[in-house]
Curated annotation (Swiss-Prot):
Gene3D superfamilies: 3.30.160.20, 3.30.70.1660, 6.10.140.1950. Methylated by PrmC. Methylation increases the termination efficiency of RF1. This is Peptide chain release factor 1. It comes from Cereibacter sphaeroides (strain ATCC 17029 / ATH 2.4.9) (Rhodobacter sphaeroides). It comes from the Bacteria. Keywords: Cytoplasm, Methylation, Protein biosynthesis. The keyword Iron does not apply. The modification N5-methylglutamine is found at Q229. Peptide chain release factor 1 directs the termination of translation in response to the peptide chain termination codons UAG and UAA. One of its GO terms (molecular function) is translation release factor activity, codon specific.
Length: 351
């Protein structure tokens, strides 16, 4: 049973927001009020449907005492009762605390791990996989920085993904992705294992955290392409070092001004993510065990090309649809991860 007083509080809050917006809230308030109103609207719709179902059931049960209506009530009651548990579960999910970062754009960072050039090639495959997934979702995918490897892979890539639910869906991708396949350069046909690391960060705005100028060092250098050759003759590439944490961010586009913007954007996202992780760890000692914890050292997934198999180790999900997955069809695995995370948070909330 979902506590009715909690539901009524939400309805009253929604009605208050509706009245404030209709009355013409102050310009400084409108954005925050509108955001909260939009978040509560689907929850209030669930509450309304649930209350209607309870009222219908109560009316049908009251009809049992009427000899003329008893038969009709006995026919209706089983179906009405059967609806209630599903509606209560939907309400519990709707009442889960929202991650404030879910509505933000995502900063996606991909780097090869163990495995040399094959790891760099796989990192490139992952970048294309996420780009296709983003395009399929109707999101905007912007490549912020790309350092290619000699054979067409990547040494490092940073992208920005913007669209409804971008970070909420992509945040489960943080971690170590392992690949098992026969490299194109392997003459003996032996299967090699290599890995790439993915980090997904919520984009941070300047108002989220202040970075004092004294805390950063900005260096300019020449941009390098595959094999380390210089791709231009001006010192346009930018490296920013955050002195308190030691975080280093680089950007090597052609415009030095744009490189500063990109590097600061990524640095803000990393620092914001550090603070989010610190707060999450303080709230729950079990956070590291949860799906979506963002632990970049965790091996989360294996892509086995000879078997056409992808296994997500966090939820023991195996799908034999690797070509489709690498082509950007991530909906099934991300939906499964979302459901698992919701179930874990529900259990924690109700414990």
């Amino acid at each position: 049973m979902v506590p009715m007083d909690r539901l009524l509080q939400i309805v009253r809050r929604f009605e208050f927001l509706e009245a404030r917006l209709s009355a013409g809230a102050a310009p400084a308030e409108i954005a925050a009020l509108s955001r909260e109103y939009a978040e509560l609207k689907p929850v209030v719709a669930e509450i309304s449907a649930y209350r209607t179902a309870l009222e219908d059931l109560a009316e049908a049960e009251a009809m049992l005492s009427d000899p003329e209506m008893r038969a009709l009530a006995e026919d209706e009651i089983p179906a009405l009762r059967a609806r209630i548990p599903g509606m209560e579960q939907a309400l519990r999910l709707a009442l889960l605390p929202k991650d404030a970062a879910d509505a933000r754009p995502a900063i996606l960072e991909i780097r090869p791990g163990t495995g040399g050039e094959e790891a760099a090639l796989f990192a490139g495959d992952l970048l294309r996989m996420y780009q296709r997934y983003a395009e399929g979702q109707g999101w905007r995918f912007e490549l912020l920085d790309l350092a290619p490897s000699e054979l067409g892979g990547i040494r490092e890539a940073t992208a920005r993904v913007e669209g409804e639910g971008a970070f909420a869906r992509l945040k489960y991708e943080s971690g170590v992705h392992r690949v098992q396949r026969v490299p194109e350069t392997e003459a003996q046909g032996r299967i090699h294992t290599s890995a790439a690391t993915v980090a997904v960060l919520p984009e941070a705005e300047e108002v989220d955290l202040e970075i004092p100028a004294a805390d950063i060092r900005i260096d300019t250098m020449r941009s390098s392409g595959a094999g380390g050759q210089h791709v231009n003759t001006t010192d346009s590439a930018v490296r920013i070092t955050h002195l308190p944490t030691g975080i280093i961010v680089t950007s090597s586009e052609k415009s030095q001004h744009r490189n500063r913007e990109i590097a600061m954007q990524v640095l803000r996202a990393r620092l914001y993510d550090l603070e989010r992780q610190r707060l999450a760890d303080a709230r729950s000692a079990d956070r590291k065990a949860q799906v979506g914890s963002g632990d970049r050292s965790e091996r989360i997934r294996t892509y086995n090309f000879p078997q056409g198999r992808m296994t997500d180790h966090r939820i023991n999900l195996t799908l034999y649809a690797l070509p489709q997955i690498m082509a950007g069809d991530l909906s099934e695995v991300i939906s499964a991860l979302t459901a698992h995370d919701q179930a874990a948070r529900l259990a924690e909330m109700e414990a």
